[in-house]
A protein has these predicted regions:
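Glycine-rich phosphate-binding loop plus the immediately following alpha-helix
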Residues: 180-184, 239-272
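ATP-binding/phosphotransfer module of carbohydrate and carboxylate kinases, centering on a glycine-rich
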Residues: 1-57, 61-129, 133-134, 254-382
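Short, acidic, Ser/Thr-enriched surface-loop or helix-capping motifs
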Residues: 94, 148, 218
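Short helix-capping/turn signature of helix-turn-helix
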Residues: 19-20, 194, 210
Length: 382
């Protein structure tokens, strides 16, 4: 008999229902071992607060319709700000990350990060027009190491001003919950489709290959952030002796050899200034760019093969401006297979991730935070 699931509060009960994508009352009675009266009292609290919705569906056996309890996502939206080195995407999403309104904007302009946040906030307010009182929070992905729960972030090329109070500024502008996350970890959080969960022992590795290179790692349902918020900072793994100086000041880093910023440097052409330029010219078959990007993708693939032996992932997701480019993705995928043992690569699903997966990850992060057991229990006690 499987162990009973501990749901000692209404908040934990809601978390279990959300994780399962919906459960019947009978399934909850079996899973939790709670008495019918106790369970129904807690469900009534959640239903009364508008956190659950109950719907009936036909029984496949023709018997009495089952009553399915699901999280009430209606009239709830998340604002996702996905900041890159040169581009940002501002999206109003459902709690599942489905885009309802979106705009892509340039961020590589004069001024600092405070000016960028001000501009993106203005766009966010424009996109939120028509979603009055539906915003549950703002999710922000940035290309820098960040301690999600404190908002402390480390200096990076894209965000050199580590002292700028980004969280406080955004809270003031939107008067709501704000969640800050590393961009590669946001990608990891959004990698799996809705309703698909990792097993407790499964590992997911998501990699963003763009202007920079970074990774997000999940173990079971948990995202790995590390003691300083730097877990997954694979761009600064040393992959060669010598070479160009990295932005971190060292030599031999993966990013200094293979990241989009480094390929722009190596191309040394007036028509190549960003990873978007590299993607465009790669797709056009430009010989120099194809050679540069293919070589970088192969090096990244070898690095990921090594990580795969350390992590034994069930899923490897590849995204970013360059990583999601057809041809580049296949090079990475093939190289992972070539440089890893069959017991590793034959049991790992390598997936191409489009740009929307980061917004999905931010929507999940905000929703999980806004409706965490602690917050839900406090809400019901008010």
């Amino acid at each position: 008999m499987p162990p009973k699931v501990s749901v000692a509060s209404p908040g934990l009960l809601l978390a279990r229902i959300r994780a399962a994508g919906g459960l019947t009352r009978q399934a909850l009675l079996q899973e939790t071992g709670m008495s019918r009266s106790t369970l129904y009292t807690r469900l009534d609290q959640l239903l009364g607060a508008g956190l659950l919705v109950e719907s009936r569906s036909g029984s496949p056996t023709g018997g009495r319709p089952a009553s399915m309890l699901t999280f009430d996502a209606a009239d709830r939206v998340v604002l996702a700000l996905d900041l890159g080195h040169h581009l940002a995407r501002v999206s109003v999403c459902s709690t599942e990350g489905v885009p309802l309104a979106e705009r892509r904007v340039q961020t590589a302009a004069s001024g600092g990060i405070a000016d960028v946040v001000a501009s993106l906030s203005d766009i966010g307010h424009e996109l939120l027009d028509g979603f009055d009182d539906q915003l549950i929070g703002v999710g922000v992905a940035i290309p820098a190491p960040v301690q999600t729960h404190t908002g402390i972030r480390w200096r990076s090329v894209a965000l050199p001003d580590a002292d700028y109070p980004m969280l406080d500024d955004l809270r003031r502008r939107f008067d709501t919950l704000v969640c800050l996350e590393n961009d590669a970890r946001a990608l990891a959080l959004g990698t799996l489709p809705d309703g698909v969960e990792l097993g407790d022992d499964d590992v997911l590795l998501a990699v963003k290959f763009s202007t920079g290179i970074g990774a997000g790692i999940m173990t079971g349902p948990a995202i790995m952030r590390g003691s300083t918020g730097s877990a997954g900072d694979i761009g600064h793994m040393r992959v060669t002796n010598g070479g160009a100086v990295c932005t971190c000041g060292a030599r031999g880093c993966l990013a200094a050899t293979a990241a989009g910023r480094s390929l722009v440097r190596d191309a040394a052409r007036d028509d190549i200034a960003t990873a978007e330029d590299l993607r465009r010219l790669y797709q056009a078959g430009d010989p120099q760019v194809v050679e540069l990007v293919t070589s970088a993708a192969a090096l990244l693939g070898r690095t990921l093969a090594g990580l795969a032996h350390a992590l034994n992932p069930a899923v490897i997701g590849i995204g970013g401006t360059l990583g999601s480019t057809p041809g580049v993705f296949e090079t990475i995928q093939t190289t992972i297979r070539e440089f890893s043992a069959s017991r590793i690569h034959e049991h790992a699903s390598v997936r191409l991730l489009d740009h929307q997966r980061s917004s999905v990850g931010l929507a999940r992060l905000v929703t999980d935070t806004a409706f965490s057991p602690t917050r839900v229990d406090a809400m019901l006690d008010e």
